[in-house]
């Protein structure tokens, strides 16, 4: 079958032919319809330090997708041929304390689809049936293909009560923009997002944020004054991994504020810990999606009127995958969809 693979320990990704995966007793075989390019896939393409330490070569990559069930393991119940599905890309062990306690997203033995095992940038994908999620009929293939990153956004945004709160989102990448849209949709008062990429800030404006702030040109404190905010932000969603953005967040949080961190900062990032301590801030690390509570919330948010369509900016045939990766690497895109039909 046709597949996009990391074939060499160097920059790039290559179309190749690989054997169709075999279906185990507890697995589903999924015929891929659409995939989306993740920032992780760009890291793998670029062959950065993280990729060199993490990705075995060769490896079929990709973990954002929607497809159709075409094969079912003999032990599987609850699915049938023809079901339209996406799936949780974190494969968990099922026997550690967190798995047995129902906190599977915190499994210490997690492996990643398209990272540690073959991914979805292929005509067919095999995953455990437990990881598959049926897509409701009123959710499009395009939206279903970005459920994985949308789940990161939902998990981060809904970590805290947002109704009536003032929310700061640092980082206007696709996940940050979706998190801001979720916050606004569920009842936050002011949702302010910051970045230095004007293209992506404009996407955030299309998604309905209160203010999208280019911090290279505009002061966040001035924006807060404009909005009549006198005490700081109640909730911070750190999506950028940029030390200056996190330091600004600490400066502008209200006392007792809560911060959810999805962005990955450098290991040597230095902050003023007195601000965390004396403001009584609560900081929560976010990894992946809660299985499967986040997935049910994703579907419900879309079904209740949350419009994610502006975040999808580019669509290509899989044969034009290079154009898709070029768009993602340029920084002048939202989500990029690759069609396998």
From Swiss-Prot:
Alphabetical GO biological process terms: L-threonine catabolic process to glycine
Assigned keywords, A-Z: Cytoplasm, Metal-binding, NAD, Oxidoreductase, Zinc
Source superkingdom: Bacteria
This protein's pathway: Amino-acid degradation; L-threonine degradation via oxydo-reductase pathway; glycine from L-threonine: step 1/2
Entry's localization field: Cytoplasm
EC number: 1.1.1.103
Residue numbers binding Zn(2+) 2: 93, 96, 99, 107
Site positions per UniProt: Important for catalytic activity for the proton relay mechanism but does not participate directly in the coordination of zinc atom: 148
Free-text comment on the cofactor: Binds 2 Zn(2+) ions per subunit.
Residues forming the catalytic site: 40 (charge relay system), 43 (charge relay system)
SUPFAM superfamilies linked: GroES-like, NAD(P)-binding Rossmann-fold domains
Family matches, as InterPro entries: ADH-like_C (IPR013149), ADH-like_N (IPR013154), ADH_Zn_CS (IPR002328), GroES-like_sf (IPR011032), L-Threonine_3-DHase (IPR004627), NAD(P)-bd_dom_sf (IPR036291), PKS_ER (IPR020843), Zn_alcohol_dh (IPR050129)
Positions of Zn(2+) 1 binding: 38, 63-64
UniProt xrefs under PANTHER family: L-THREONINE 3-DEHYDROGENASE
Subunit annotation: Homotetramer.
Protein name (Swiss-Prot/TrEMBL): L-threonine 3-dehydrogenase
Source organism of this protein record: Salmonella gallinarum (strain 287/91 / NCTC 13346)
């Amino acid at each position: 079958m046709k597949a996009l693979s990391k074939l060499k320990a160097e920059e790039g990704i290559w179309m190749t032919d690989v054997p169709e995966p075999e279906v185990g007793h507890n697995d589903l075989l999924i015929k891929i319809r659409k995939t989306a390019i993740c920032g992780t896939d760009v890291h793998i393409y670029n062959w950065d330090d993280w990729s060199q330490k993490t990705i075995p070569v060769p490896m079929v990559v990709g973990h954002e997708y929607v497809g159709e069930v075409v094969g079912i393991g003999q032990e599987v119940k609850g699915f049938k041929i023809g079901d339209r599905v996406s799936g949780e890309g974190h494969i968990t062990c099922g026997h550690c304390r967190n798995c047995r306690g129902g906190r599977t997203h915190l499994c210490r033995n997690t492996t990643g689809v398209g990272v540690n095992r073959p991914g979805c940038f292929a005509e067919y994908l095999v995953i455990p049936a437990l990881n598959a999620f049926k897509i409701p009929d009123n959710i499009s293939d395009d939206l279903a293909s970005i459920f994985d990153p949308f789940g990161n956004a939902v998990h981060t945004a809904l970590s805290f009560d947002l109704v009536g709160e003032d929310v700061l989102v640092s980082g206007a990448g696709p996940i940050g923009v979706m998190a801001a849209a979720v916050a606004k949709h569920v009842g936050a008062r002011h949702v302010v997002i910051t970045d230095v990429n004007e293209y992506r800030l404009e996407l955030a404006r299309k998604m309905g944020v209160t203010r999208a702030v280019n911090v290279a040109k505009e002061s966040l404190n001035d924006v807060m004054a404009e909005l009549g905010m006198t005490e700081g932000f109640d909730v911070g969603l750190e999506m950028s991994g940029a030390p200056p953005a996190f330091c600004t967040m600490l400066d502008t949080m209200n006392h007792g504020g809560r911060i959810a961190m999805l962005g990955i900062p450098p290991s040597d990032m230095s902050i003023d810990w007195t601000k965390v301590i004396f403001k009584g801030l609560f900081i929560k690390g976010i990894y992946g999606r809660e299985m499967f509570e986040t997935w049910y919330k994703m579907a419900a948010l879309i079904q209740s009127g949350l419009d994610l369509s502006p975040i999808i900016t580019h669509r290509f045939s899989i044969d034009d995958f290079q154009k898709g990766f070029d768009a993602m690497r340029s920084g002048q895109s939202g989500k990029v969809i690759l069609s396998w039909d």
